[in-house]
Each structure stands twice: as structure tokens, then as C-alpha cells.
A protein has these predicted regions:
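N-terminal secretory signal peptides that target proteins for export/translocation
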Residues: 1-23
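Short capping motifs at secondary-structure boundaries
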Residues: 67-74, 95-105, 194-204, 231-233, ...
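Short, compositionally biased
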Residues: 2, 24-39, 43-51, 101-200, ...
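Surface-exposed recognition segments
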Residues: 162, 166-176, 249, 257-259, ...
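Proline-centered structural pivot motif
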Residues: 65-73, 91-101, 202-205, 262, ...
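Short aromatic-cysteine micro-motif
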Residues: 137-143, 167-249, 271-292, 366
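Alpha-helical segments with a strong preference for the paired helices of cellulosomal dockerin domains
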Residues: 52-73, 81-101, 192-195, 222
């Protein structure tokens, strides 16, 4: 299509650079104008003018809203002249496509919008897109890959598998709302990533050809704080961790099943790990694209532990008890059965302790 291409449909004319209107007669004319404008989904101004339904894309549904308000007052009045008319339609068509995303100052963009082959849950994809933040980024300083976890509401707590029930500290189940998006490491922190920052390797599983890409372990909650302060990262809260692990599922395991044998596809655990850790990312990701949320190594989260906390937990952005003797661990590990890799299972340890099946995953604010 040339830079200046004209399509004429009765009293409706459309140029590549602008549209003019003698009268508005049919939706087919509008569609033809859109075609003449070659309106493909591309990033645009951050203001996202014309996105009337808030899904971060200016497209057919927004056009329908605007036409439904024709010659009336409404959100479709994009130029603010008091009436929805042809000028507003021209603005919308000129802004057609995806809204631009915000890339955090600490990050390097990899992919702006969620890949449906990775973020397989359509509700999560829509929530990520609606956030206005880039989906997949690298932390520039560490080159660690991070994925956006959108805000959302979920039921936190006990989900039984076909073979195992819950323990008391997984109850009562309760609704939790996370109001802010955050970034989560796509993988557990590896031995190499730890060594680059901390100049030593505490891990038990060194000396293998893939050791650099195995999760770092033998790291205490207390020691991890030095790594976090040097990188600007943080540990996820327990609620953030479970929301990210579940990735829209309500089943025992984050693959959408409560059938214990299916764990083999998503987790390194006692029956398939061969008494050792494995390189991160070797098992299937969950519906947010996060790997090893179940199995491989336990993951420290930020919260103190209190077995009765779920009974008094705030429903919005819970951060755990204000004090305690133990910190929470999540996700199970290579040493444990399917019971422990359930999305709701909670374990604990003293913050100064280390074990060869305990590691961590980072989070970061946008």
C-alpha cells in the first residue's frame, strides 16, 4: 500500500494519513478505511488513546463502543469537544493497534506482550496486557530473566491431591487479592548467578557438567539478603509465591491436575530426581511460564511462619506475621514426595539454616 492511498466508499473517504467524513453510513465503510490505513497491532503512545475497554489494544471492541455513543457524550469523545463524531473516529483509527508497554528502568525488554504458547491461561494473558507493563524482561545488571505476574484474586490454601491430604497450617482456605503486578524470576537462582554476585559457591552439587545452571542451594534466608541487596531484588511474599505457582489453577498441582503421577512432567522430586538437583527449566513451566515452582529445591519466601496465620491473614496483599522464629519455604524439592510439591504445601526452617535442597527465586517491583 502506498504512503497516500485513497479508498472511497460513497460519502466516506480515507487516506493513509487521515480520514475525512461527509456522512457515516455503514460499518463496512469503516472496516474498509481500517484496511486502507493498514492498521496492524503495533506499539503506540503510552497514553493509549482510543482504548475504551482498557485491554491495552485499540481494536474492534473499542470501535463498537465508540459507534454506540455516536453523536452522544461519552468516553468515545476522544478530542473532548463534547460529542462523539467523525473526528473521534479518525483519532481511534490513527491509534489502532497495541498500546505501548512500560519497561522498568532496571530492565531490558525481551518481549512486550505475553506469548500464548507460554502464558497459556487466557485470563492471565489479558491481565498482563492490561497492566501496561512489559511481559518478559532481563534484569539488566544480572541478566536474569523475569516474567510479569499480574494482579489478581485467588483462593489460597489447602488443595488435596488424589494421594495426599492437607496439613493444618494450609487451612482455612481464604480469598487473597494482590493489587500490584510484580516480576518473578523465570527460574530458580542458579549456581552461576550466585557466584557472579557473591564470589563463592556454597552448593553441594558442584562438579557436574551442568552445575552452573543448577539451582544454588545451601543458602540461608539470612545469607540471601546480601544477594538481594546487591541486586535490587527481593523475595516474593508467600501469597505472591502461591499465586504465581498456581497460575490460575485450583488443583493440587500447577499443571491443572490433582493426580499425583502427573507431577513427573513439572517437578524434580524423590521419584525422578536421582537424589540430586537438576538444571533449571528442565520440566514443563506453569501457565505463567515459570519453571520449577514445584520440586528441584525448596524456595525461601519472605514471610515469617505462624501456623494460625491463615485465620487472621488480611485479604489484600498479605505480608505474613510481623515476627517469628521460622521463615516459610515453598515448592518441595528433589528429596520429597508429591505431597510436598502441592501448590498449597507450606514448610519452614530457621532463617540461618542451610540444606542442600533449599534455594530461592527472586521477585522485583516494576
Amino acid at each position: 500500500m502506498t504512503t497516500r492511498q485513497l479508498s472511497e466508499f460513497g460519502n466516506f473517504k480515507c487516506f493513509k494519513s487521515r480520514c475525512s467524513f461527509r456522512s457515516l453510513t455503514t460499518l463496512s465503510a469503516l472496516a474498509a478505511c481500517a484496511a486502507a490505513l493498514a492498521v496492524t497491532p503495533t506499539a503506540r503512545a503510552q497514553s493509549c488513546v482510543g482504548d475504551l475497554n482498557g485491554d491495552r489494544i485499540v481494536n474492534g471492541p473499542d470501535l463498537g463502543i465508540l459507534l454506540g455513543q455516536w453523536e452522544q457524550v461519552g468516553p468515545g469523545d476522544l478530542d473532548g469537544n463534547g460529542v462523539v463524531d467523525g473526528a473521534d473516529l479518525g483519532i481511534m483509527l490513527g491509534a489502532w493497534g497495541r498500546c505501548a508497554v512500560t519497561v522498568p528502568s532496571w530492565a531490558t525488554l525481551v518481549e512486550a506482550m505475553p506469548d500464548p504458547a507460554v502464558v497459556t491461561d487466557s485470563t492471565l494473558r489479558a491481565a498482563i496486557s492490561a497492566s501496561g507493563l512489559a511481559w518478559r524482561v532481563l534484569d539488566t545488571a544480572t541478566q536474569m530473566e523475569m516474567l510479569l505476574v499480574p494482579p489478581g484474586t485467588f483462593t489460597m490454601g489447602c488443595t488435596t491431591s488424589n494421594a495426599f491430604g492437607c496439613v493444618s497450617n494450609e487451612n482455612p482456605t481464604h480469598l487473597v487479592t494482590l493489587t500490584q503486578p510484580f516480576y518473578m524470576g523465570r527460574y530458580e537462582v542458579t549456581q552461576l548467578q550466585w557466584v557472579v554476585r557473591m564470589a563463592s559457591n556454597p552448593s553441594s552439587f558442584q562438579g557436574y557438567s551442568d552445575s552452573a545452571n543448577r539451582p544454588v542451594e545451601q543458602v540461608s534466608w539470612t545469607t540471601i539478603q546480601g544477594y538481594l541487596s546487591s541486586t535490587g531484588m527481593r523475595l516474593p511474599s508467600e501469597a505472591e509465591w502461591e499465586f504465581a505457582c498456581r497460575a490460575g489453577t485450583t488443583t493440587a498441582f500447577n499443571n491443572g491436575s490433582s493426580d499425583d503421577p502427573t507431577v513427573d512432567t513439572i517437578a524434580w522430586y524423590v521419584s525422578n530426581a536421582g537424589n540430586q538437583t537438576h538444571a533449571v527449566g528442565g520440566k514443563a513451566a506453569n501457565s505463567l511460564g515459570l519453571h520449577d515452582m514445584s520440586g528441584n529445591v525448596w524456595e525461601w519466601v519472605n514471610d515469617w511462619f505462624d501456623g494460625g496465620y491463615y485465620s487472621v491473614s488480611p485479604s489484600t496483599n498479605p505480608l505474613g506475621p510481623v515476627s517469628g522464629s521460622y521463615r516459610v519455604l515453598r515448592g518441595g524439592s528433589w528429596r520429597f514426595s508429591t505431597d510436598f510439591v502441592r501448590s498449597s504445601y507450606r514448610s519452614i526452617n530457621s532463617p540461618g539454616n542451610t540444606l542442600n535442597n533449599i534455594g530461592f527465586r527472586v521477585a522485583r517491583n516494576p
